[in-house]
Curated annotation (Swiss-Prot):
PANTHER family: MITOCHONDRIAL RIBOSOME PROTEIN L39/PROLYL-TRNA LIGASE FAMILY MEMBER, PROLINE--TRNA LIGASE
Gene3D superfamilies linked: Anticodon-binding domain, Bira Bifunctional Protein, Domain 2
Keyword Nucleus: no
Primary location recorded for the protein, binned into one broad class: cytoplasm
Quaternary structure and interacting proteins, as annotated: Homodimer.
HAMAP family with a match to the protein in the record: Pro_tRNA_synth_type2
One cellular-component annotation, GO: cytosol
Catalytic activity annotation: tRNA(Pro) + L-proline + ATP = L-prolyl-tRNA(Pro) + AMP + diphosphate
Gene Ontology molecular function: ATP binding; proline-tRNA ligase activity
Name of this chain's protein: Proline--tRNA ligase
Cellular location(s): Cytoplasm
One GO term of the biological process aspect: prolyl-tRNA aminoacylation
C-alpha cells in the first residue's frame, strides 16, 4: 500500500479527551474516531489490526473443534424473560420496540439465543458435544464509557457456547477453550495468565479470566512469578485427549493467581517472596461453565443412550477483539508510539523514501516495494512529500515492525538501513538481501 493513496489521518497533537495510552495512540495513529460516547468508527489502519486479531481467534477456535456461525444483534425480549435475566442487566441493556410495539433489545450477550437455537435442532446425545461461536458487535450502555475502545458501549466480541450431555463432557469442553485461549493470546505475543474469576451475571460455578500484565490495567492481580516463564501449549495439542487437556489445565492453575476480588492473602504469602508478583492487569478473555443454568429454563434436553431425557450442560467463552487491540497497545508501547507483535501488525514492513523526488531513491523504493509485495509481505510504502523526520515519527507511531530507510547517501554505498521497531536496532544491508534478512 502506498501511503500517498492510503487513508491514514495521523494526529500530531495528543487528544485532550484521551486518558490512557491506548486511547491516545489509537486516535493519533488514525486507527479509530469517536462518533458518540463510547461508540467508535474503525478506520482502515485500525481495521487491519482488528481483522488480524479476529483471524487468529478464528484459527484457534476452529482448531479446537468449535464451529463458526452468526447470530443477529437484535434479540426478542421474550427470550430473556424465559431465562429470567431480562431485568438482571438493568440499564446496561439497550431496550427498543419495533413498529409493531414488540419489545426487542440490542444483545449484550447470546446465551439465551444460542440455547433456543440448539433446543430447536439438537434432540439426541449423538449430536453432542457441540461448540458454536460467532464474532459479533454488541452493545452495553455503560454509565461512563471511557478509555476509548478499552471500555466502550459498542464492542466486538467472540463468544462461543458449548453443549454437552453431562458434567464430565462439559468439563472437557471447558478445558478445550482454556487451552485454545492460551494459544490464541500467545500467538498475539501476549503472556496471558488464567485466574479464578467471579461468574457475575453470566452465572455458573467455574470461571477463569485471562489477564495480561500492564501498568495501566484496571485490575489488581497477584500471582506466582513462574507464570511468566511458562510455555503455551503447542500447535499439535490433541483436543480430543481429555486427560492431556486436563494436565495442561492443572499445570496452568496449580500456581497461585488471582484478581483482587478472589485474592487470598494467606495463600499469596505462602509463595516464596522472590516469586510473588503484585501488579496490575487487563482482562482479555473470560470463560464460564454454568451447567444447566440456561438449558433448564429453556427445556434444552436430548435423548440419551439410556433412552432417558438429559438436560444439556453448557459453557460460554468470550474474547473481546476490539478491547484486545487496546490491551495490546497498553502492554506494548514506548514514548514514540505502538510496538505491535508481528502477528497482528497492520503492515509488516514499512519503506521510507527519505528523499522524495529523487529518481535514484524512488527507483530503489519501487523495486523493494514490488519484491516484498510479491513475496507476500504487507508493505506500507511512505512515498509522500513529508520530510524524513516526519516519516520516522509516523513509522514509529503506527508501529511498523520492520522499517527500511532508503536514502541517497546509503544507496551510494549500495546499502539501505533496516530498523527493527521493537528494540530500535539498525543495520546497513544491501537492498537485494532484504528478503533473506526478513525471513531469518
Amino acid at each position: 500500500m502506498r501511503l500517498s493513496r492510503y487513508f491514514l489521518p495521523i494526529l500530531r497533537e495528543v487528544p485532550k479527551e484521551a486518558e490512557i495510552v491506548s486511547h491516545r495512540l489509537m486516535l493519533r495513529a488514525g486507527m479509530i474516531r469517536q462518533e458518540s460516547a463510547g461508540i467508535y468508527a474503525w478506520l482502515p489502519f485500525g481495521l487491519r489490526v482488528l481483522n488480524k486479531v479476529c483471524n487468529i481467534i478464528r484459527e484457534e477456535q476452529n482448531r479446537s473443534g468449535a464451529i463458526e456461525m452468526l447470530m443477529p444483534t437484535i434479540q426478542s425480549a421474550d427470550l430473556w424473560r424465559e431465562s429470567g435475566r431480562y431485568d438482571d442487566y438493568g440499564k446496561e441493556m439497550l431496550r427498543i420496540k419495533d413498529r409493531h410495539e414488540r419489545e426487542m433489545l440490542f444483545g449484550p450477550t447470546n446465551e439465551e439465543m444460542i440455547t433456543e437455537i440448539v433446543r430447536a435442532y439438537v434432540k439426541s446425545y449423538k449430536a453432542l458435544p457441540l461448540n458454536l461461536y460467532h464474532i459479533q458487535w454488541k452493545f452495553r450502555d455503560e454509565v461512563r464509557p471511557r478509555f476509548g475502545v478499552y471500555r466502550s458501549r459498542e464492542f466486538l466480541m467472540k463468544d462461543a457456547y458449548s453443549f454437552d450431555l453431562d458434567a464430565a463432557g462439559a468439563r472437557h469442553s471447558y478445558n478445550k477453550m482454556f487451552v485454545a485461549y492460551l494459544r490464541t493470546f500467545a500467538r498475539m505475543g501476549l503472556k496471558a495468565i488464567p485466574m479464578v474469576a467471579d461468574t457475575g451475571p453470566i452465572g455458573g460455578n467455574l470461571s477463569h479470566e485471562f489477564i495480561i500484565l500492564a501498568s495501566t490495567g484496571e485490575s489488581e492481580v497477584f500471582c506466582h512469578g513462574d507464570y511468566l516463564e511458562m510455555a503455551p501449549p503447542s500447535a499439535d495439542v490433541n483436543f480430543d485427549d481429555a486427560a492431556g487437556l486436563q494436565s495442561v489445565f492443572d499445570r496452568w492453575t496449580e500456581l497461585y493467581a488471582a484478581t483482587s476480588e478472589k485474592h487470598d492473602e494467606a495463600a499469596f504469602a505462602a509463595i516464596p517472596e522472590a516469586s510473588r508478583m503484585a501488579a496490575r492487569g487487563i482482562e482479555v478473555g473470560h470463560i464460564f461453565y454454568f451447567g444447566t443454568k440456561y438449558s433448564e429454563p429453556f427445556g434444552a434436553k436430548v435423548l440419551g443412550a439410556d433412552g432417558a431425557e438429559h438436560t444439556i450442560h453448557m459453557g460460554s467463552y468470550g474474547i473481546g477483539p476490539s478491547r484486545l487491540v487496546a490491551a495490546m497497545i497498553e502492554a506494548s508501547h514506548d514514548d514514540n508510539g505502538i510496538i505491535w507483535p508481528d502477528a497482528v501488525a497492520p503492515f509488516q514492513v514499512g519503506i521510507l523514501n527519505l528523499k522524495a523526488g529523487d529518481s535514484t531513491t524512488g527507483a530503489a523504493c519501487e523495486k523493494l516495494y514490488a519484491e516484498l509485495t510479491a513475496a507476500g509481505y504487507d508493505v506500507l510504502y511512505d512515498d509522500t512529500e513529508e520530510r524524513a523526520g516526519a516519516k520516522f515519527a509516523t513509522a514509529d507511531l503506527i508501529g511498523l515492525p520492520w522499517q527500511i530507510l532508503v536514502g541517497p547517501k546509503g544507496l551510494a554505498d549500495g546499502k539501505v538501513e533496516l530498523k527493527r521497531r521493537v528494540d530500535g536496532s539498525r543495520e546497513l544491508i544491501a537492498p537485494g538481501d532484504i528478503l533473506e534478512r526478513l525471513k531469518a
